[in-house]
Amino acid sequence: MLSFCRAPLPPRTHRADESLIIYEDGASSLEFRKSSPEDYLLRNMHPPWDTKKPSIMVPPFHFHIYQTEHFRIVSGSCHLFKDTATKPWKTLSADDPNGVKTASIPPNTYHTINNASTTEPLVIDVSLTPEDVEGEERFFRNFFGYLDDCRKAGQAPSLFQLMVFLNDSDTPLGLPIFPKWLGVAASRAFLQGMGLFGRYVLGYQPSYAEYYREKKMI
């Protein structure tokens, strides 16, 4: 293992026991709730959109290999991008009575979201099916906990660490390669290569005790 070659990890903030986690000095948050067929697992708050300083909550262009991702607007408005990161596919709006309130993205479809407003926060519910409650909570807690700790430490996140998190959740970055089938295949290969190298050569972990408390199996 060549862990001595990797970028230093930031000091980790202990958040494993919090169901509502505050990030970016109060500007954003994640709230985990008990799973049920009628509800969404995750409630996510984004600050107003700032092109010069995007929130850590804005996900990179990505896709899910096996899961469909579902979105439900709670307050504010949200741009949802599908297949292209330059033009919104849909805008979800809580204030427009005739506006779209929910949307779903099937597996192997590039997508991302951002706050459609530059003045108001966005609150949106997120779930994935088929559901993996522990796996999803572990990923979100580690991914955003790490990004926020990097922000506080004033250091750039390690791409290898991010890919270790993403590989553990079967979520490739959407590489801009055409045709689509080739982009999906290349993105999956890039995810596995970077994720495995980051974990088994550089020693990055898919989960840290400060961010996520592993559930005990009975």
Question: Which role fits each region the language model picked out?
Answer:
Residues 1-68, 72, 79-218:
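Jelly-roll (double-stranded beta-helix
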